[in-house]
């Protein structure tokens, strides 16, 4: 594994170049401000009069349309949602590419699954922070950084890796360390983690536990505390020191239950299903399914989302969180 740090990156590779950050959302606001504070010339783009456009103005940027930003920039970072990138590229970016420009991504979906196929005379690389935008910004302001991934898909200039590392340094990532990967590896592992563990896996586990207790006659409020609320306490321990630290920190009773019962939940059948999910990602089955779902107006996505929002755990959770003044209400 190759890891790059500050001493491996040189901001001079960005001298005389303009970086366009298209999409002033979570990552966009952080990366653009960090680059600017590192002395890089930055322009930002979003939808005129949108909330993001106004936020960019509040941050002392003069936002442009995507077409204008792509025309002006030498390095173009695309930070709009995956499902919108291909159309944005076709309509606003591709017409403004010229030999020697560079395209940057923070997720490899559209390049890996060939929804975006750049011409051969541009550089294509990835800088992917492993943390949300607000953390990328806060760590930079505190003189630290968020670990990130770097990958080069196309090296027309012969300097794509140096450009990528300079970009990573500009957002503060090389302070923490930047791990070299590929678009394929980043895309497939990211999707698998979301589907099998971080989002799909954990939500189904939480809800299955909640339903089991409620169906057995226990109060929904107690089930919520035991299966969802306390999840943060455990995840924080794992996040800070790994599984071993979590096990060291919990009671012996809890650890014994973990060691003897956990494998009855995640069985060999579960592991086989995980392999199937990974294969669907590797073969492009999931990507085609998701792209088609967007093309026809997201009927399955919207129906499933409505159904999930009406689950008992949501209404119980909303009521209980109202008892917790330390929780800030998030606007979704």
UniProtKB/Swiss-Prot annotation:
GO molecular function, one term: ketol-acid reductoisomerase activity
HAMAP family: IlvC (MF_00435)
Name of the protein: Ketol-acid reductoisomerase (NAD(+))
Family in the record: Belongs to the ketol-acid reductoisomerase family.
The organism of origin for this protein: Thermacetogenium phaeum (strain ATCC BAA-254 / DSM 26808 / PB)
Entry superkingdom: Bacteria
Binding-site list for NAD(+): 24-27, 50, 82-85, 133
Domain KARI C-terminal knotted span(s) in chain numbering: 182-327
Keywords per UniProt: Amino-acid biosynthesis, Branched-chain amino acid biosynthesis, Magnesium, Metal-binding, NAD, Oxidoreductase
Binding site for substrate: 251
Cofactor remark: Binds 2 magnesium ions per subunit.
